[in-house]
């Protein structure tokens, strides 16, 4: 698969275009995956603006991509997403993008990688995890700690089941009872229990609610990682997606153009 950046797309525009929905997968009552046929390049960690005429638009992360398609995990939480949930396979959805920088795959290759993600924050990093699970020669040790509120909120259950045994995958729940598939507690509880090897070369990715990112990064630093080894995903109030409206500005950076993936050596300087 190509790792092209959508920054190179010559037709990059503020005007959305219609694209066909190939399939819809219902992970939970509130979270559905829309696979959409596209003719533009995409990269894990980037995002598109998804819209419907006379309804509005919303920024949605690219959770995975392939030859001529992208996956968008959409949570039904507002006017736009509620309207999207009335669509079916074969219908059109309007997209503009891709936008943002995406994950630094070349920097991550052949190094130990720890991914810590919570809730729908699993979606922006899901495709990257799948790539490394399916291409173990491209990565060192791969550890994944994924947290959800309860069993009913777990995303990508079928795929996660195939990942077990190939790499260290920990699924942890805020609520419920532990069994052979799930542990109980927050992602930081599981991280506290983990012994990290190859600290000097390890890379870490943290995706989720802001408070989760804050405490997870703090723990990683306490465990010996340097800010330069940590990557965070800040998805904040993006509107125009081209750095003009200022809604997503954090200090001197714009999440939509400078991010949403930031090295923590940069992110720690944000004056929010």
Curated annotation (Swiss-Prot):
[2Fe-2S] cluster binds at residues 240, 245, 248, 256. GO terms for molecular function: 2 iron, 2 sulfur cluster binding; flavin adenine dinucleotide binding; metal ion binding; oxidoreductase activity. Its main location: cytoplasm. Pathway: Sulfur metabolism; sulfite reduction. It holds the Pfam family DHODB_Fe-S_bind. GO terms for biological process: pyrimidine nucleotide biosynthetic process. The keyword Electron transport applies. One of its GO terms (cellular component) is cytoplasm. NAD(+) binds at residues 166, 168-213. It is found in: Cytoplasm. InterPro entries: Cyt_c3_hydrogenase_gsu, Dihydroorotate_DH_Fe-S-bd, FAD-bd_FR_type, FNR_nucleotide-bd, OxRdtase_FAD/NAD-bd, PyrK_electron_transfer, Riboflavin_synthase-like_b-brl, Sulphite_reductase_B. FAD binds at residues 113-129. CDD domains: sulfite_reductase_like. Induction: By sulfite. Repressed by oxygen. Residues 14-105 form the FAD-binding FR-type domain. PROSITE patterns: FAD_FR. Keywords: 2Fe-2S, Cytoplasm, Electron transport, FAD, Flavoprotein, Iron, Iron-sulfur, Metal-binding, NAD, Transport. Belongs to the PyrK family. NCBIfam families: sulfite_red_B. This enzyme catalyzes the hydrogen sulfide production from sulfite. It is strictly anaerobic. It is regulated by electron acceptors rather than by cysteine. The anaerobic sulfite reductase seems to consist of three subunits. This is Anaerobic sulfite reductase subunit B. It comes from Salmonella typhimurium (strain LT2 / SGSC1412 / ATCC 700720).
